[in-house]
Amino acid sequence: DTIINESVPDCYADLGYKTVSTNPCGEIPLCPYDSCRLLAINLFSYVENPFTKKASFNFKLFKEHVAAAQRIMDDIIDLELEKVDAILAKIDADPEGNEVKGVERNLWLNIRKKAEEGRRTGIGITAEGDMLAALGIQYGSKEGNNFSEEIHKTIAVEAYRASVYTAKERGAFTIFDSESEKDNPFILRLKEADEKLYYDMLEHGRRNIALLTIAPTGTTSLMTQTTSGIEPVFLPVYKRRRKVNPNDKNVRVDFVDEVGDSWEEYVVFHHRFKEWMEVNGFSTEKNYTQKELDKLVKKSPYYKATSNDVDWLNKVRMQGAVQKWVDHSISVTINLPNDVSEELVGNLYLEAWQAGCKGVTVYRDGSRSGVLISNDEKKSEDEQDTLTPFPTKRPEILEADVVRFQNNKDKWIAFIGLIDDKPYEIFTGLADDEDGILLPRWVEEGLIIKNRNQDGVSRYDFQFENKRGYKTT
């Protein structure tokens, strides 16, 4: 088993550090009661002169920041222990007897023991895909895989160096035993990469039982406006639509739907693709046609480097190369088309194992509902739709529910048009205001009627039945 054989904490399995499971995304194999703190370093931020011929990676600054990050992670463990102590103090102060609160108290004591004893950290990265593009290196290529391996080797050596340095100052994690780790493949790779670091570790120990991981960093990448984790870019550019009023000044109508509503199309750029455009003199304000967008992508370093373009086997091999320098694990997803064969999926799993991956996730398009939805999904001929088909043309009259709600300090009202008791459209506005929508508070339902003025502009009226049975619009 690759995890057990490569795991540094599993060298201490006899002391309770045998891996039994992982966190939900799989990047942290854990023993019972243990936990891990995660931190992600933005690789793109170390590329100087990105998207130019002078682009380079600042390894000097990168090494300094890796060391600082490891120090921060160790400090966070102490802060975490303070919080656990506060929880234990609260449990002790509670009026219930030990037979009631004993289980919870023992749980937190075990969590505290593992955190203090092993001091596990999880230094990771994000923006690997953007970093490679900014350097002019294609994701998934041999050059790209080699450079990624060098990056993660650097992280491993510098993070472990920082942990050894901190051990000199603060002491090693309490169960450190160099004899238990002497045959661990990861530790031996560190020895080969930097013998001085290895012998310093033999002399002083290190502060943390394990230090490295690569998480999905989905939310983190939204903050950094980069690709996530070790993944390539999903799409560098795509088009969206927004509804517009055709009578507004300077409005542009690109599409009119079946019910006569007008839409404007606009281009959404991946932030770093937009930066590439600006560096290379392409306008980011122009309304490009799809053909023009395709030509732009073809000129960019993101060409043939999206999640759908990258060769699946090469991606697995890249993960395996990087995994050699990550003492925990890596969260990676291989996106496959719906019609992929079982044989190919089997080959990917086998290749992942042979490449040295500790885990791999395969997602087949459409294999789970509500996860990812593609535009080209098709129903099988023998599949019967039990739901009423969604109308391609809006009925003139829709039943509607009325919902009143508070928006900060303002009172609002919403009219929800329904088809088969499911929301189809929503109109909202201020309520109980001179300029708002005046409607008796007892009205909870009615009709939304679509009409056209003499000038052809659509309008929507709400109609309800008053207490005397008369229709009011």
Across the structure, where does each feature detected by a protein language model lie?
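Short, Gly/Pro- and small/polar-rich lid/capping loops
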Residues: 192-203, 374-418
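Extended, hydrophobic alpha-helical segments in both membrane/secreted and soluble proteins
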Residues: 124-127, 159-163, 330, 345-348
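Short coil/turn segments at secondary-structure boundaries
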Residues: 1-8, 84-92, 111, 171-181, ...
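A general alpha-helix detector
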Residues: 127-131, 147, 162, 473
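Structured mid-domain segments that build the active-site/substrate or prosthetic-cofactor binding neighborhood
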Residues: 1-122, 219, 249, 428, ...
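Contiguous, well-ordered alpha-helical segments that form the cores/surfaces of helical PPI scaffolds
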Residues: 40, 119-134, 150, 219-222
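Catalytic alpha/beta core of large soluble enzyme barrels
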Residues: 26-27, 73, 77-85, 187, ...
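Internal maturation/activation junctions in enzymes
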Residues: 65-112, 116, 138-217, 225, ...
